[in-house]
Amino acid sequence: MHLRLLIAFISAALVVSECFAQDKSQPTVDELVAKNIEAKGGASALRGLGTLRLSGKLLVQEGQIQLTYMQINKRPDEVRTEASLQGMTQIEAYDGKEGWKVSPFFGRKDPERMSADDVKALVEDAEMDGPLVDWQAKGNTVEYLGTEDVDGTPAHKLKVVRKNGDVSFVYLDPDHFLEIRVLTQRIRHGAQEEVETDLGDYEKAGDVFVPTSIEFGRKGDPDKQRIIIDKVEANVPVVDTIFHFPGFQIGLPQPQR
């Protein structure tokens, strides 16, 4: 009887010890966020990045159609994207308060204000540092969910609940701690949509690393769109008017060649 009690006690102690060791080895949210910030260049470098211009191409329909692409960000929360083909330019912009678009490929050549649901993705694009940096100040909550396989990589998985209730699952590379995938669940026009974005080929813009390969689309959809960035520029001069709803179209300043 005593032997059985001793064996049970030892077994329980081993289980507790193993659980404690596992808990101890699990990184915390703060540790992962700190490593993510450091991987991007550090807090000082991020603060020093006032504007960011990305130039390249947008591939759609499995790469059969190629558009010229440009995105420009300005702190604190302004963004504008342009995609051009055959003399027509699709524009989407957000000035920190409202979003608007020009959709010539759909026969709509005049600027139109975007609905609160339609502008959600653009608001996320306006976050130059991503959802993890300063997450508390943004009103987000972040939870560590362990590791999950991302195309053969055991990535750290973080759940980010935004202030508006939308959820993003952020996957960090276990060695470099940069984002390699973001799965966002948002309510749009009364229905939930899941958008999966894969990020890679990080390059420096000034002193900050940014992804230059971006593939995105609805989760499970094989026909995803891909952005390939050929040029990254940090702290370029930008006028605020390009983000505001215009009475007429204002083109982006072109990158220097």
What are these regions (language model features)?
Residues 241-257:
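Short, low-complexity, Pro/Ser/Thr/Gly-rich segments in the mature regions of secreted, periplasmic
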Residues 22-30:
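Cleaved targeting-peptide boundary
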Residues 1-5:
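Positively charged n-region of N-terminal signal peptides that target proteins for export
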Residues 30-107, 139-146:
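N-terminal mature ectodomain segment of secretory-pathway/periplasmic proteins
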Residues 121-159, 178-181:
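Short, conserved active-site entrance elements at the starts or edges of catalytic domains
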Residues 100-129:
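Acidic/charged, solvent-exposed loop-and-adjacent secondary-structure segments enriched in E/D, K/R, S/T
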Residues 21, 88, 151-246:
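Gly/Pro-enriched, hydrophobic low-complexity segments
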Residues 6-18:
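Bacterial N-terminal signal peptides
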